[in-house]
Amino acid sequence: MTSIILIPARMASTRLPGKPLADIAGRTMIAQVVARALESGVGRVVVATDTEEVAAAARAEGVEAVMTRADHQSGSDRIFEALQTIDPGATAEIVINLQGDLPTIPPEDIRAVVRPLENADTDIATLGVEISDEEEKANPNVVKIVGVPVKTASDALRLRALYFTRATAPWGEGPLFHHIGIYAYRRRALERFVALPPGTLEMRERLEQLRALEAGMRIEAEIVRSVPLGVDTPADLERARQLLSARTESR
């Protein structure tokens, strides 16, 4: 299956304006995310942005960039506009939505998100991590996957998602899983998803992936080892600088 990685990036972040161009270990954040995408070897890498400076920074890293409208409500809408521009012939069968604020994501996790699509019945794939921190279980900013295990050829842990929630769920004994917001869509699934109106549960939980579940689409989550650092605040940015500076120095 031919895959393409699309990285949505916008400058108008509420909590950390201008973050795609923030310096992290001598490179812009968008450059760091592009590097992780290229290291994954999954496929063509394209940055989708509404700001020419971000596009220029991406092109400086040797990848394509496409300008999109500034009024998109979600990264899914932004990457779909970009996809129509850069792949009008629909050659890419799998579309990966890699958030532009994940500079520390392991390349192997980008590869992992594609694996659930080996099941022909799966429309959308994503990632999760088993929660080990008790505080995370009750944290509404940590989205939980409510799902059931599915068999895999490699015996990897994978869930069929039945629901996503900010609540502590499911109830009772057993592990809870932290959702990581990277997605791999079958192209036809992305086309269907962006054409759907917002769902009732989506609006209540403020989680756009619930739109797909409400519409009967199948989402599977590959379970990986750790949650990548999402850069949303100045404190997150400083932590990313520490992590990537240490990684650079150890080489």
UniProtKB/Swiss-Prot annotation:
One of the GO biological process terms: CMP-keto-3-deoxy-D-manno-octulosonic acid biosynthetic process
Top EC category: transferase
Subcellular location: Cytoplasm
A cellular component annotation (GO) from this entry: cytosol
Pfam families recorded: CTP_transf_3
Gene3D superfamilies linked: Spore Coat Polysaccharide Biosynthesis Protein SpsA, Chain A (3.90.550.10)
MF terms (GO), sorted A to Z: 3-deoxy-manno-octulosonate cytidylyltransferase activity
InterPro entries reported in the protein's UniProt record: Cytidylyl_trans, KdsB, Nucleotide-diphossugar_trans
Pathway, per record: Nucleotide-sugar biosynthesis; CMP-3-deoxy-D-manno-octulosonate biosynthesis; CMP-3-deoxy-D-manno-octulosonate from 3-deoxy-D-manno-octulosonate and CTP: step 1/1; Bacterial outer membrane biogenesis; lipopolysaccharide biosynthesis
Keywords of this entry: Cytoplasm, Lipopolysaccharide biosynthesis, Nucleotidyltransferase, Transferase
EC number: 2.7.7.38
Similarity section: Belongs to the KdsB family.
HAMAP family, alphabetized: KdsB (MF_00057)
Function: Activates KDO (a required 8-carbon sugar) for incorporation into bacterial lipopolysaccharide in Gram-negative bacteria.
Protein name as annotated: 3-deoxy-manno-octulosonate cytidylyltransferase
